[in-house]
Amino acid sequence: MEVLGLLKFEVSGTVVTVTLSVVLLALLKWYSTSAFSRLRKLGIRHPEPSPFVGNLMFFRQGFWESHLELRERYGPLCGYYLGRRMYIVISDPDMIKEVLVENFSNFSNRMASGLEPKLIADSVLMLRDRRWEEVRGALMSAFSPEKLNEMTPLISQACELLLSHLKHSAASGDAFDIQRCYCCFTTNVVASVAFGIEVNSQDAPEDPFVQHCQRVFAFSTPRPLLALILSFPSIMVPLARILPNKNRDELNGFFNTLIRNVIALRDKQTAEERRGDFLQMVLDAQRSMSSVGVEAFDMVTEALSSAECMGDPPQRCHPTSTAKPLTVDEIAGQAFLFLIAGHEITTNTLSFITYLLATHPECQERLLKEVDLFMEKHPAPEYCNLQEGLPYLDMVVAETLRMYPPAFRFTREAAQDCEVLGQHIPAGSVLEIAVGALHHDPEHWPNPETFDPERFTAEARLQQKPFTYLPFGAGPRSCLGVRLGLLVVKLTLLQVLHKFRFEACPETQVPLQLESKSALCPKNGVYVKIVSR
């Protein structure tokens, strides 16, 4: 009897184990696909998702090619899943206008993953709701034409180092990767303009600032870990935030300490002793007791107009005595954001322009003539000179940003349930603006793969359908640093093309292969020859 009882217990234990295993497997199977019915219920077309990871493998070649494929397969309104998160992708200009402008109050925030470094989380890029509005309003004055004119000499100083290195490349006559030169140059610009220090990243790569910048840009999340985070976000995201991360803590500590030291130094200096850099503009804005309102936040329209230096439009100021001043962490966040955006986007834009000029010599010749005439009139260029006197350069830059927009996708998050041109959007949904797909839509841009600066003559701009050209976004949350970014690009090209011309060579990759992770960039560099003029 005892043997039978023991056997019965063992059988019962086995049954329980098997039953629990079956239940667990059933729950896992349900969990692996339970989030993947939302797009279908909304009537939005999308690729078939895989269990747990959604459409992660669809993007294995990068987001650039995949966005173009999404548009071709599913149209200007489609979607996908990354892990359990649903993305609604739009490249229809009328829907984009509704999201970015007409219904901005419901789409004022960017998507946050919860894994952003503290320096990014404290920047105007990722701040949310009222705090974003306060900080953005306070920072607007730092990007006025007058303030940018004060920063122009610092950028010109960094250009001198770049010209010196290009002179050696011209003398050698060898092909070289000019993207690497631009990378060093933009590091120098960011160090000077955003952090208030002087570095020479090409000749002194051991500089601590340069070393830490390289660590920032070398970081990437391993694909297996990314798949795990996307599959189990409610567990993995909080876990990743609390687990020790030596690299993250060291980078955050370095840049935060650097900013604090510079701020302490500026506090001891007189107004005349302080550098006219971006950091000082932010510090000045912090001390200001007024800011502009949301209705004046869109800087892109003005920045893309040559008439902006005729006087800024009146900005409605609101007292901000009840708003908390920028914290040191937030000031560090703005400088760090300048590092990320200024380095990646400026480097890639300069690289793409160089490639296009080298492979389109007739366009380069026309631009060289304009540059020479401009430099005769303005040997020491200022911000407003650059806005008014280089129309063909503006056209070349604009067409490059159409073909190769470095920031080729960005997100908005729906605060409440709403409808956008008849499409229901649930609260919490992430909308992704597919700038790359929009810029390569033949309906709006005939022969989109052809480099044609004539698309951006003054007359042609008037014929463009609104919200079909978005290299800097649009609306109140468009790129805050658009003026400064264009200033760096245009001043650099002006200085370089006044001394050199670009030539394609056997090492030049045609067509250019692209890589798209956080930003669009040349995959294998840009190899050209450079010739002294």
From Swiss-Prot:
Keyword Lyase among UniProt keywords: yes
Catalytic activity: prostaglandin H2 = thromboxane A2; prostaglandin H2 = (12S)-hydroxy-(5Z,8E,10E)-heptadecatrienoate + malonaldehyde; a hydroperoxyeicosatetraenoate = an oxoeicosatetraenoate + H2O; (15S)-hydroperoxy-(5Z,8Z,11Z,13E)-eicosatetraenoate = 15-oxo-(5Z,8Z,11Z,13E)-eicosatetraenoate + H2O
Cofactor(s) this protein cannot do without: heme
EC number from the UniProt entry: 5.3.99.5, 4.2.1.152
Transmembrane segments: 11-31, 76-96, 224-244, 336-356
Listed GO biological process terms: icosanoid metabolic process; intracellular chloride ion homeostasis; positive regulation of vasoconstriction; prostaglandin biosynthetic process; response to ethanol; response to fatty acid
Disulphide-bridged cysteine pairs: none
Keywords recorded for this protein, A-Z: Endoplasmic reticulum, Fatty acid biosynthesis, Fatty acid metabolism, Heme, Iron, Isomerase, Lipid biosynthesis, Lipid metabolism, Lyase, Membrane, Metal-binding, Monooxygenase, Oxidoreductase, Prostaglandin biosynthesis, Prostaglandin metabolism, Transmembrane, Transmembrane helix
Single annotated GO MF: monooxygenase activity
Cell compartment(s), UniProt: Endoplasmic reticulum membrane
Residue ranges, Cytoplasmic side: 1-10, 97-223, 357-533
Binding site for heme: C479
Gene Ontology cellular component terms for the protein in this record: cytosol; endoplasmic reticulum membrane
Location (main, coarse): endoplasmic reticulum
Membrane-related topology note: Multi-pass membrane protein
Assembly and interaction partners: Monomer.
Function per UniProt: Catalyzes the conversion of prostaglandin H2 (PGH2) to thromboxane A2 (TXA2), a potent inducer of blood vessel constriction and platelet aggregation. Also cleaves PGH2 to 12-hydroxy-heptadecatrienoicacid (12-HHT) and malondialdehyde, which is known to act as a mediator of DNA damage. 12-HHT and malondialdehyde are formed stoichiometrically in the same amounts as TXA2. Additionally, displays dehydratase activity, toward (15S)-hydroperoxy-(5Z,8Z,11Z,13E)-eicosatetraenoate (15(S)-HPETE) producing 15-KETE and 15-HETE.
Similarity comment: Belongs to the cytochrome P450 family.
Name under which the protein is recorded: Thromboxane-A synthase
Native source species: Rattus norvegicus
